[in-house]
Amino acid sequence: MAALSEHFTLCGLLTGTDDGKSEILGVEPAGEPDRVLVTDSVQAVTLYKVSDQKPQGAWAVKQGQSITCPAVLNPESGEFIVVHDDKVLRIWKEDNVNLDIAFKATLSADVCRIHTLPNTDPLVLFKGGAVHFLDSLLTDPQQKIGTVLSDGERIVWSEIFADDGQPLIVYLTQQFSNYFVYIHKFSPVCVCKYHLKPNTEDSTILDCSGSVKSKIFTLLTLYSSGQVCQTPFPVSLINKETERVVSASPLLQLSGPIEVGALNFLDESHVAVLISSSSEQKECLSIWNTTFQTLQAARNFQQRTSAQLWCYDNKLFVPHGKTLVVVPYVCEASCLASVLGKSRNIQTSVLENVPFVNWDKLVGKDPETKPSNAGAQKKTRERKTNANAGNGTESILYPFDVQNISQTQTEAFVQQLLLGKEDTDFQITVGKITQGLVKRCMADPKFYPQSSFVQLVQTNTLSYSLCPDLLSLFLEKRDVPLLQLCLHSFPDVPEVILCSCLKAFLSISEKLVNAAQINTELASLYIDVGDKDKEHKYTEHPEEPSVLQNGFSPTALEEDSCDELIAESLPQTTQKATCPISIKRAVLVNSILISPYNESFLLPHLKDMSGDQVMFFLRYLLYLYLKFNENITINHPGKQMPTVSQIVDWMSMLLDAHFATVVMLSDAKALLNKIQKTVKSQLKFYSEMNKIEGCLAELKELKCPARVSARYSIEVLQLY
């Protein structure tokens, strides 16, 4: 989402044209986030501190001279640079009061713009299209400057970008009704020219903006037809080949044709547009979401502006009448739910301005809206409030200030908070309280209200995006019960946190696991825990297996093995496996197996697991797989149970991430052999099932003649 704040006036502007319009050449950053350089169209350069709305320095050229290029700050030397009369360079420091005595250099060609980047020497763009570093020009100001542009071609827009730390100059030129894009690279030095075809005929480009991300330069263009178009340029493919033709694809459709306008790229999904129409004597500044093509914020200006727009430090600068106004803005990451106004991921900046719980209503002071037992609840809540007040803390009445109350008072307050579940602001309140408690715990390691966290998580109103530091705190505290509870409650746990929880569950000591309060009632119905010190134990039963259960038996494994025979073959009897890990640890690991994830994002984090953790996890996954395939009719209870598909998916991902490591481990051969035989047996089972399915399908297609008879008969069909 995006929003525009109230605008304010930064400075007045001089009138530099006969029609009374006030135009400026540019607004450029001045080193610090709160300072800008304003270059007017007459004779002056002024340094402003935006928050104070006051000038901190001003410099002017002589009468008869005119500034032809916006002043910029050289971030390397801290000096200001400006060009007057097209060819004359002036370089000075902030403490210089007179521009006449500043360093002067006269160049041999007209300058269009000077562009700067941090950690890069300033680049000078000439009107002929050539680009030179400032240092090389100062060594020989009268050196010959080449020409890149054709006759009648002029630069209408230019900007500098950073591509992996290297400067990238992009400028747009116009030749009659044709537009061309030039991209200058400097490592290695090369220039590429593109012929930009407009999306609609008879439309002109009013302004441009752009960005570089992942080796792709994206050019945004504002057309007089009211369209905002985008054109991608792969930076890695730029070379000195012949001119290429590219077309602009429509991105946004604004309201009808426009006379003048300005465009500025804010972030990867937001763009600011300033437009005016001939039908209305006013202009509109708006912020659009380019991902979902939605209008996020708008502001109307009653007076005409000069259709110029600059953006620095989350502030938009707009010449309005005879003043330069500043419009602060906020852009937050957007998703489809937030665009539709249904997002549950409430950001901190939004929380600060949201009205929270009505505490008078919470303690039951409005008996008319309460049910019949409201009187008893009211007395109970009043007793709790009075008891807390007797402890000498006033913070209980202000629940969002949880930084100074004791742990006992915190637990009492959370219990009182949960009584207001029916309040419309309950979810926001729980999120705010949780954020405050997490912040307090990180600042004070001795403060950790575990029971309060349990109650807050059990409300099922929290999510990872609402309180991202909560799971990190539980990982730091090794609080495995709360980690398990969050995994069951949060719908948006990222893969990196999911993998961190898995490693914590596998590596935490058995003493801490046994001490944790974990419900194992359901798990005990399908997990057989034997000797925990042994990796995998089998116990024999005296009876021979009469049937194959779900396609698995040790005999079939030995008969179908394609590997060399091992010294000690598996016994020809039914084998009952015992879980290689404790039942509480198994419950924790199961909470990982049933959590949602994206394989592409999870796989890189799985590679950080150690070899011991991988073997430990693989043994348990194999145990679960064999256990769930013992009998196809087993009904495993509960919703917190992994399915066979989930087990197989995790086993596959783990082997994909660590196969090269596992095959080098000495104790992994037997385990991999069991996995391979089990998978082969299942493949054979499903192959036979497919054959039966084909036979049944043929039988279904057979059309038997209808028989009218009062008697019934039984027909036996032999499949094999």
From Swiss-Prot:
This is Nucleolar protein 11. Residues 365-392 are annotated as: Disordered. It comes from Xenopus laevis. Ribosome biogenesis factor. May be required for both optimal rDNA transcription and pre-rRNA processing. GO terms for cellular component: nucleolus. It comes from the Eukaryota. Keywords: Activator, Nucleus, Ribosome biogenesis, rRNA processing, Transcription, Transcription regulation. It is found in: Nucleus, Nucleolus. Pfam families: Nol11_C, NOL11_N. GO terms for molecular function: RNA binding. One of its GO terms (biological process) is maturation of SSU-rRNA.
